[in-house]
Amino acid sequence: MIKKTILLLIFSVILTSCVPYKQLEELGIINTRGVDVTENNRVETTIIAYQFDAQNPQITTSTTGVGKTIKGARENAGYNTNFELSPGQIRLELYGKETAEEGILEYLSTLVRDARVSDTMLVAISNITANEVLTVGQEELNTDVGQIIQSLIEKEVKEYSIPKTSLQHFLHIEADIGQDPVAPIIGLRNNKPAIVGIGAFSNDRLVGELHIDQAFLINTFLTNVKGTPMEISLPREPFVDFIFNNETNSMQPDKLEDKEHLTILVRISKGKGDITLKNIDDLHFEANVHLEVDLYESSELLSVKNKKIAAILEEEIEKEFKRQYDVLLAKLQEIDSDPLGFGGIYRTKKKGERLTDTEWREKYPNITVDFNVNVDLMHYGTIQ
Amino acid sequence: MRKRMKRSSKNVFPLKIDELEQLMKSEFDKSPDLSFSKYEHQNKKIAVFFIPYQVQPDRVENLLLTPLLESKEEWSNTAILNKIPLNSGKEYQQMDEILPGLIAGKVMIYIEDEAAVVSYDFLNKEKRSLEGAETESVVIGPKIAFTESLVTNLNVIRWNIRTPDLAIEEITIGKRAPREVRLIYLKSLANDTDVDTMRQRLNELDVDNVEDSNVLMQYIEDDSASIFPQFHTTELPDRTSYAILKGKIAVLMENSPSALIAPSTFFSFFESTEDLYMRWNSGSPLRFIRFMSMFISVVLTPMYVAAVTFHYEIIPTQLLISIGQSRAGVPFPPVFEALFLELMIELLREAGARLPTKVGQTIGIVGGVVVGTAAVQAGITSNILIIFITISALASFTAPSYQMGTSIRLLRFPMIVLAGILGLIGIMFGLCMLIIHLLKMTSLGRPYLSPIYPIRFEDLNKALYRLPQNFQYKRFISLSLKDSIRFSKRNAKEKKDIDE
Amino acid sequence: MEINVKIKPNMRIQAFYLFFIIVSMQIGVGILGVPRLVFSEAKQDSWISILVAAAYVIIVLLAMLLILKQYDNADIHGIHRDIFGKWLGKIFSTVYILYFAIAFYSVLLTYIEVVKVFVFPDVSNFVMGLLLISLTIYGVLGGLRVIIGVSFVFGVLANWILFLLIHPALQIDFNHYLPLFQAPFVDLLKGARATSYTFMGFEILFLVYPFIQNKNKVRISSLLAVTWSSLLVLSATMLAIGFFSAEQLERREWAVLVLFKTQSFPFVERFDYIVVAELMMVVVPSLLFLMWGLTYSMKRVYKVKQKLTLYVAAIIFLIGTFFFEKHFETQRVINFAEQFGFWFIYVYPFVLLPLVLLKKRLKKRKGAGSS
């Protein structure tokens, strides 16, 4: 028994002298980090961190630091704060536009190398510099701007309006041959942060900016979308007979001349797109998109009384989506970014040599795609 | 005979009454309690001696002295034994039987020149009446608890298990101050090896005295270095009879209000008879909650310490902010904070146990609410930790066995220290050590972690959860009983269609 | 040294536990790194490699069982003694002991490195070694019965980690498995060879066989064990291939651990930390069996008391943890263990089998001649 106790004592003495403490309240816990490249290839990082100080009720602070590497910049930022900045809780990584255009892989891979960094953090880019978004936002809102941007993105991801943009997703898609990642673009609207678009990458370089609605189109090919609200403009022409005229209290069309479009709001309750390679030599693809939509709102009193009008509505929505997809593809081919993953499909069908990135970059602008959109109008709400 | 030098074993009879008086007075010279009265009856000298407070005086007078002295009979030992209508008459010749007999409430009668003393049993044992259980309180089911009187306890057990199959063996242990111990089991059920082991351990026990059955347990358990109790001690007769009927062995001890049950497994300590009285589908979750709370009680506070000291990454951001804010002003590292609070809880519990019930409750409120709030406001502890500590303290009190509950509560301290030194790795090290320890333990030579290891799938149904009675037609297989079938399995109900 | 081992009845174990013995020996730290190793050889056809490897393991296992069946109740040391005689047999048995030592050392170092990379970069090898070795000593002191209990209980308790893989499994990109059948045959074999370190461990059968009570169940139990471990390795590899892109997977040292990084719950943000800690429950049984194999073999071959070997070996290993701090040094130990084990576990039984059969036939003939 005595032997055991002595052993235990020696044991605990050795143990106590081993792992340095990293107590929560002595750390500055980085929540959001912005990265910009300044002149002379120096990295400027803007850090929003939590620090818990009994004297100071304000728990978020922002600091900036400049350095040659991102870790160096963090060290540099550390001189401004009395807490040790630590990266284990980074939830959002924001890259300035110029930085993203030069490529962000080097920054991302430093993140991955550190096992303590979370893989689920969000990756976003800003249309100005990251520093500006974070500091202006912070001053304007006087709360944790990082949190706000995160919830903005998370909300949209939950609605499937934009594709998932966690670090793991971004890296995985970036590293896949024949597919390119996208990331939301955060800008300032009335000096408040907002999602202003979606950035298309070619490998790890930002090459173009897409409209936020186009993000949904991309997302249908990446995942099964559910419950996404969406505004669609349809030509008014086919519906004139079915628009209820409030003034005349009849189905007579109103004055036509000033209106060309009818805008409806739908909720896409289910959506799924898949790509098949029709002809491997011509690089001809077929992309089928199936959407189930519920009608929520329309800009005019549209009365959906019978099957016929529903069919017209479906057809017009299909047409509109097809047009949008064609526009999207043209734009993507122009900037040589392939977020829909045509290259991935091509790779799985290609025999022999493995597909290389450069090979696909050459082929991509020449591919042709037939988009077939199939819309099922499921519900119309409580009124007809 | 006289040559035998050992005083207590010499046979002194026959002798004169006065000689006997001298002898008895010298034996009891330091405690002048012996009542020694001499009577002349039909020309014979009769001495009646006893210790007054050990006997019931009016019964002695009515049942023994009156018939003895008012009769015209010429008394001899045989005449007394034959004529006096009492059933406990015995003859003693040796001093080492007479002296303990006096202490055990016997009245001795000696007729001059006879070769032996006649004794009758008039024990007057002061005892409290049967009361409800205090430490192991139950909501439904029988509530009486054992008392300090062995006879009463045996009476209760006998009345619970009304079969001649019940064996109650008597063993006396303790050299200086002997105590009676009873080994109770069902002859047709209990495993012979287990009974032999238990009997042997009791017989071979070579100690001066044993204070209580909880002490007895420590003398005879398998591994005295372990923190876990290896035999179950309970104050519920209900529970004891349940265990005996399951084929286990119980040990009752004079002057001890708790019974030992052996062999016990780790899981049996979390078993309450209430689980039986509840229906199976409400009993099983309750037992599951007890297992869960044991785990929570051991792991929750260490997890907090580990997360706050080393692994802030695993805390979700929102929780991190509130933990961080509450930790902000605390001047100690989390380990000391946690140890301090755990110590406070232990203080409260200990004070509550010592103080009278009503004061104890007040102390609980003062300690828990007032000191807790003040500690948080003074900034020496964080309020989130107080929540964790309270939950784990509560959880540790759910164990139906007080001994096991205490073991689990004490286990937290080394776990907290390990968590404070090596974080999650330390906790896992502690858990691994604990499980290996449990695997190494035995109770009466049977694996402590049974029926998990060695695995007995049929026993899981009783040890970990309960199924409807129809599924419990077997007794514990791991106990290797003589008869492991409780009842023949009822035939499956005929399958009926709807509306038939 | 007798060829056949007499085991007291209370030391006997059921063949049922053989499943847990073999699984806990096979599934250890090896499975964490195996996806990368196989993938870098066989690419998306890794599953074929693993199936090939599993089939080969089953063949080896059947050969081992055939060898053991030729004797009443012998273990590998008794067989060595019988086939090679006193001195040569001792040499072969010593190689076996060395193998246990090296395997123990490699498992120890790998787990320490995982902890250092994922949880505590600053922890010293010595402290981690002290923890694991004290667990080993404590467990081995309990004897084979307790060690098997540990492998059983820990084996059951550690399984909940598998549920954490559901989340990454839902994010699999099935295109990563396509196109099928691209890897040349040589690469497939290379991929199969890369799993050898992971699949090691079933050789413990050579030692525990005499302890088993119901010998008729040995075959089914051990085959199920090997199948289950192969399934685990296969699904871990497939998950990693589906989850990571090729480029990522080739660079991730412990891809399986990274899979856990994406799972989060409202009360726990990061599960990889908990999984690394929980891995101790996976590693300790292997350590216990390897240490037990070492001490028991020493007793069988050299008649050294098990306790003595245990304490001496523990001290040597503890000192040994000082010397391999760097990643590539650890890798060298693992590679050495792998090379060593490959010839010894996967090839050697096929050398032994004909010798045993030959010897038996000779004996029979002799027996027939004399009678």
PLM feature segments, named:
Chain B
Residues 303-306, 316-319, 331-500:
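Generic detector of multi-pass transmembrane helix bundles and their immediately adjacent loops
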Residues 283, 321-333:
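Short aromatic-rich membrane-water interface segments that cap or initiate transmembrane helices
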Residues 278, 282-285, 326, 352, ...:
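Membrane-interfacial loop-to-transmembrane-helix junctions in polytopic alpha-helical membrane proteins
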Residues 1-299, 314-317, 438-500:
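Membrane-embedded alpha-helical signal segments
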Residues 311:
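Functional cleft and adjacent loop/helix regions within the main domain
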